[in-house]
């Protein structure tokens, strides 16, 4: 494969968003609140915005029993299991408030339980949660119903409960199989344990198993990560998410326990990425884009081939243009042309629900310019190409005129082999996929106007 040169890194490996949304969550505003969110829900229910798009649900379970030092998620570290029961009571309040505006029986084609650690909940609490959701929503046959699993918190019996509850996709947080790396990031889980769980998942009939990996963690080397990849290839999950570790200790306190001198240098981190791409593609995985891989017959790979890939707050998805109802503390949702976020602290979340309010505290109503740029950015992030005429027809604009400045900026990337510009469109090259966040940033009006990007991780 092509080699990422130091010159490319120096020029294009800059801090930038991951574009799970556009505009990105850092652009949300407290001027957008509960009333705006309720209006969006009511417009969906009344059909005033046209045909209802499919509905996706995200439920955030923030609790973890122990702290992983690399973590940048919104979580609560606690050994007090009773907190889950109390949280479940507030999730019920939140769901019931949604039902006031949407009615019961909205069809759901996608559900994701994330965290935190969803399996912090007991089997009975998970049963109560799913009963609550089924009481208020209609889960359609053939949908994608997934849950994030910490291998340290489950056994085959617990996986059987998840299957019984209707989950058909599992995502295991592995990160790295190297014991020294696991120790230094405070997440020890033997490889044998993960292998046994994945084998059990297959016996239980789960349609898809995902494994999360992180490169750039302390004490990792290209050679040690090669060994982790070899084990992952033996494991043969249906999907692999390969994330770059973003060391931002000024934003995420747990990362302050990681010593900077233990982190791999930039060249080593790039070597891990390029060698991972080689190893996984040679093993038969399809490179979906940026940080995702899938076996050729997995729904994600099929969606990419058919041009149906989408990107949402959980990463790449087969569920294009869903409305997303987000439940739980800090959750981010999307209804129509709006984004909304719940209160980030448990105290604020609970207080708002106790007052009878939906816990939305910030968000954004997208402008026409936002919507056009979102369609451009998502085409580049998901398909790696776009045709000017498709944007022209969808939005009744002239792409080359509207984005003349952006096309000029892309010429520098074309000169370095990252994109190909033609009379009809833009194509991201094989090398350009490494820097696709940077390609998308060219069309991000907010980032272009804001030179202070230290809140973002670097692209590679």
Regions picked out by a protein language model, each given a short descriptive name:
Residues 414-424:
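A short, conserved structural fragment
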Residues 46-47, 54, 77-101, 106-400, ...:
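C-terminal scaffold of the Radical SAM
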Residues 1-55:
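Flexible, acidic/Gly-rich N-terminal and inter-domain linker regions that tether
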Residues 431-460:
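Short, amphipathic alpha-helical interaction segments positioned at domain boundaries
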Residues 398-414:
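Short amphipathic alpha-helical interaction segments
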